[in-house]
Curated annotation (Swiss-Prot):
GO terms for molecular function: 1-phosphatidylinositol binding; clathrin binding; clathrin heavy chain binding; phosphatidylinositol-4,5-bisphosphate binding; SNARE binding. The lineage of its organism: Eukaryota, Metazoa, Ecdysozoa, Nematoda, Chromadorea. It is found in: Membrane, Clathrin-coated pit; Golgi apparatus; Cytoplasmic vesicle, Clathrin-coated vesicle. High levels in the nervous system and at lower levels in other tissues. In neurons, enriched at presynaptic terminals and is also present in cell bodies. Binds clathrin and phosphatidylinositol 4,5-bisphosphate. One of its GO terms (cellular component) is extrinsic component of presynaptic endocytic zone membrane. PROSITE patterns: ENTH. Belongs to the PICALM/SNAP91 family. This is Phosphatidylinositol-binding clathrin assembly protein unc-11. InterPro entries: ANTH_dom, ANTH_dom_sf, AP180-like, ENTH, ENTH_VHS. Assembly protein recruiting clathrin and adaptor protein complex 2 (AP2) to cell membranes at sites of coated-pit formation and clathrin-vesicle assembly. May be required to determine the amount of membrane to be recycled, possibly by regulating the size of the clathrin cage. Involved in AP2-dependent clathrin-mediated endocytosis at the neuromuscular junction. Required for the efficient targeting of the synaptic vesicle protein synaptobrevin. It comes from the Eukaryota.
Amino acid sequence: MQTIEKALHQPMPFTTGGQTISDRLTAAKHSLAGSQLGKTICKATTEEVMAPKKKHLDYLLHCTNEPNVSIPSMANLLIERTQNPNWTVVYKALITIHNIMCYGNERFSQYLASCNTTFNLTAFVDKVGGAGGYDMSTHVRRYAKYIGEKINTYRMCAFDFCKVKRGREDGLLRTMHTDKLLKTIPILQNQIDALLEFSVTTSELNNGVINCSFILLFRDLIRLFACYNDGIINVLEKYFDMNKKQCRDALDTYKSFLTRLDKVAEFLRVAESVGIDRGEIPDLTRAPASLLEALEAHLIHLEGGKAPPPTQQHVAPHQFTTGFAFSQQPQPALGDAERQRYIELEQERLRQFEDQKKSINSANPFANDVASAAPAPATSAAQPDLLDMFQSSAAPAPQTADVTNPFGNFAAPSAFPTNVPPPAAHSAPFGVQPAPQHSAAPFYANLHQAPPMQSQAPNGHQAAPFGYPNAHPDDLARMTAQMSLNQQGAPAGWNTTTSAVSNNPFGATSAPQPMYTAPMGMYQQPFGAQPMWNPAMAAYGQQYGYGQPVPPQQQHQIQLVHAAMAAKNAAQAQQAQAASADPFGL
């Protein structure tokens, strides 16, 4: 009898696939019964040590979507094949069930979850005695345990974790309520644990049957771990809003997540070694230890204890495995006595700060004057105060011009800023109105009417000569030129029969001197153009090149202007030295 049994399970000599006589007899039995579904299941679960053929699996997947195909009959036939004594038949039957649950109609999973039949393969041992049958029995038991846990998960949750939505927006576990989430995650953990128990080596994956089941398990693990990660993120987001019991369960869940993370990484390394594309393998990074410390500290705070100080104060958000960064760190609990001591210290520091501020204000004699200084309207009569240094420059007393000092009027600064033009009443330099134009000095009139050459400072403000921040540069240059020309003797041939009215604002008693009448046809500029030489620019030492050389007569005038500016600077330095020696003007 045993000899006949062995003969039935021996490969047939004239077949290339290694089918046995038992496989042919089973297929013939279903053919005589007219069951194409049974015949296909038998062909998909033969004793050949190779994965089920794709054409048989596709036919079974198509049958699950047909309304006239009995799902219970298909499931019962597959469960019947799992009771075969040959490990290859049992293993291939489990692969077929797993493949239909993943890619077939959901009615198949619903029937397996609703019926009470189980695989009952916890003590399976190969009875045929083929090559490696005893060693492969261990893989059969582990694989059957995972399939049974997958069916049990569907029975408890009414959905398959491998088919639910995942992600931040509409993920099932990402948007689940706290109570239901804490009850669902342990079920998912049990399924992941059953999957991770299926541990194989690289050499064992050379077997076609084992390799086929490993690929299906790898795809399930990627989907299950994605759901698991969404659930952990949801737990961490709601952790600080949970009560004490929920926080304790959530902390245990997170600790188990860290433990399973290492096992998942080991499983993925095996998958990478057998040639699975690295693009399908996720990158797993462990969360920092400070995250676990923060969760434990919050739980201790809820339980009324004192949390230990954290070992790491700052945690980068990109280091979280779950991709979630906390915006608030839980603070350790403080006793009433310690809190009162902190309050007293803060009050003492505040009192010391106020005393120090009062002492600084009392020691500064100018604090009240500066704080109370405000622009007041000008009065007709102001009392000079020799000790008031802040108001001495606000309303200067009018000084009588010294006739012997040609630079006396330069010491009085203008009350207008450099970048704002003065009013019309002070359009003339230093308040002196220009004299009427003389027929003997047409160049002098043109000099006053020439458009001013404005030079902008790098910061956008109008530049001014050094020592005269409020004086217009063109006005100063014209005055210096007039002064230097009027101090020279009148050469022969000049018309000295002019009016007795003086055009020199620097000396009221000096006789008026006519300007040199240069030929206007040679140097006269067209209307609206810039002059060839501007005394204002010559006063600053800048060179003008408008395409024509400067005449010798005007070069002499430039030298005179430079000499006058040097004398003016020397007089100003003397006045500054005298003022520093006597600060009160006595």
